[in-house]
């Protein structure tokens, strides 16, 4: 069902102002659990390949019409979890803002986790994003390390993480 109570029409595209999104995945070894590791499922062998896209259509607000496409991968093999995603995003301003430019961005991440003990998982992640658009310099890169401890019998997980935020291609560095 669609909530039509407050739906407006886009001034630019003359269609309902909504987030239109879709995702297509291929899981050749059965359904991939939506977990980044689970101590109760340490004998899994799953893999996922995906493609996603979305268009966010704004109405008369002084905002943007955004388009995003992405590729994803995830794998769960016994004690090991791996995942990666890459995406492209285009931000186009609405006519009301009187800005004729649009901006394109690239980003992505890779992450992994490994159970070193029955309830203790070590994890690492690396994010990258060109926050000034593909036409200008200015990348953020954020490496992170962490650990997850899963308590027995209560569906509770304790997480600890250290993340460093760095940038390059800017006039000043962090």
Regions found by a protein language model. Name each.
Residues 10-12, 96-98, 136:
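Outer-membrane beta-barrel and related beta-rich outer-membrane complex signature
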Residues 5, 70, 162-168:
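A short, acidic, flexible beta-alpha connecting loop/helix-capping segment that sits on the rim
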Residues 2-8, 29, 56:
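Short acidic/polar capping segments at secondary-structure boundaries
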Residues 19-31, 147-151, 156, 170-174:
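Outer-membrane beta-barrel "beta-signal"
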Residues 7-19:
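Surface loops at the rim/top face of extracytoplasmic beta-rich domains
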Residues 113, 117-163:
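Outer membrane beta-barrel transmembrane domains
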Residues 23-132:
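Detector for outer-membrane/organellar transmembrane beta-barrel domains
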């Amino acid at each position: 069902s669609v909530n039509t109570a407050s739906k407006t029409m886009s001034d630019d595209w003359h269609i309902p102002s909504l987030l239109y999104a879709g995702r297509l995945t291929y899981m050749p070894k059965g359904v991939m659990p939506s977990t980044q590791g689970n101590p109760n499922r340490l004998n899994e062998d799953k893999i996922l390949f995906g493609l996603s896209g979305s268009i966010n259509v704004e109405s008369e607000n002084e905002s943007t019409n955004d388009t995003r496409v992405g590729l994803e991968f995830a794998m769960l093999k016994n004690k090991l979890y791996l995942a990666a995603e890459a995406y492209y995003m285009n931000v186009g301003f609405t006519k009301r803002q009187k800005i004729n430019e649009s901006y394109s961005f690239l980003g992505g991440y890779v992450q992994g986790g490994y159970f070193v003990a029955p309830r203790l998982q070590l994890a690492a992640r690396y994010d990258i994003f060109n926050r000034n658009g593909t036409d200008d310099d200015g990348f953020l890169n954020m490496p992170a390390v962490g650990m997850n401890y899963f308590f027995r019998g209560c569906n509770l997980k304790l997480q600890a993480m250290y993340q460093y935020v760095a940038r390059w291609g800017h006039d000043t560095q962090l």
